Each structure stands twice: as C-alpha cells, then as structure tokens.
Amino acid sequence: MGKFVNSVDEFFDYCKENEVAFVDFRFTDMIGTWHHITYNMSAINKGHFEEGVPFDASSIDAWQPIEKSDMILKPDAQSAFLDPFTADSTIIVFCDVYDIYKGQMYEKCPRSIAKKAMEHLKNSGIADTAYFGPENEFFVFDSVRIVDNIHCAKYEIDTEEGDWNDDKDFVDGYNTGHRPRTKGGYFPVQPVDSMVDLRAEMVQTLEK
C-alpha cells in the first residue's frame, strides 16, 4: 500500500487536494542514477497510468540503440509523494520501464530486476518476503572542484569541519578552532558536530 495514495483515482484526488502543478515521472539507470520526465498536471490522465509515458531510452547510457529507442514508463501510483523542494507543487511518481519491442518489463530497469527477483523467491519457495535495508551514509562538502584537462587532473574538496581549516579566518562567521581529526568524526557532540540541525531537518522532511 502507498503512504499517500493506493490507487490511480486516489492519486488524482490527492493531486487536486494539494493543488499539484507538475508530475515528475522518475526512473533509475543500471547504476542507480535518477532520471525524470516532468509533465504539467493538466496534461496527465488515467491513460498515462494504463498505457505509460513514452521516452527516448537511447539517451540513457548502455540502454537502447537509437533505432530501438522508444520505451515506456509505467507509473506506480502507490509510490507517489510530494516533492518538498520544488518551487511549484510537484508530485513524484516512480516508474517501471517497459520494453515495447519485447512486450515486457525492461531487463535493464532496476525496479524490473527487483520485481523479477521477488517473483523468483516466491515461485521457488526460497522465501515469500525480502527485506532491504539501505545504509544512508554520505559526506557534506562546502565546495567540490574538479579539473580534468590535457595538462592536469585534480580534485579539491572543502568543508568547514575539515581539520585543515583550524586557523582559517571565516568572513561570514567565527572559527571554533576545534575539529575532529581524520576518521574522528563519529559520535562527537556540538560544536564538533556541526550538522545536527541539517540531519534533523532531513529526518523531519523524510517523515512528512
């Protein structure tokens, strides 16, 4: 069951209730990179959920050749949720990718692969349910610069929490002068942990 809607009819009711202006159809490639197609809400009808949304799959790395580029996105209404960051009210809908040439789910679509794996688990009797627990860990940088030219290649990252900034004179703030050493940023409290408020905002946004 979806968190906000459980059917296509509920989807349109939910969009009307929240004055949704745009529908963002999303899918991922083989390495998990997000891709999307955005439609004006007024251009969407139930037929898009039944027949799908066409797109050019040759634009996705390692997917389709140009002569067989036409593919279909099948929206999953139960996956819909409001985008908390867009200026205009936008609803995000995850999609399955369908191969119109074979008349089946696309073998390079991660959602299709997961669904086939679940079906195999049940049909083989190995299990009836699979649980996935992604570990959401990432770094927050203030600046990332990359150079890849014929005469040089480098990257440079910066963060206020980096110990190389112990003596930096911050123009728009003050320097606490106390920072974790390399690999020393696990479990410290403020002021060493400067991301408390950011994490709290992320959690609250995810729970909405």
Please give the residue ranges for each predicted region.
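Glycine-rich, acidic/polar active-site loops that bind/position phosphate-bearing ligands
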Residues: 1-208
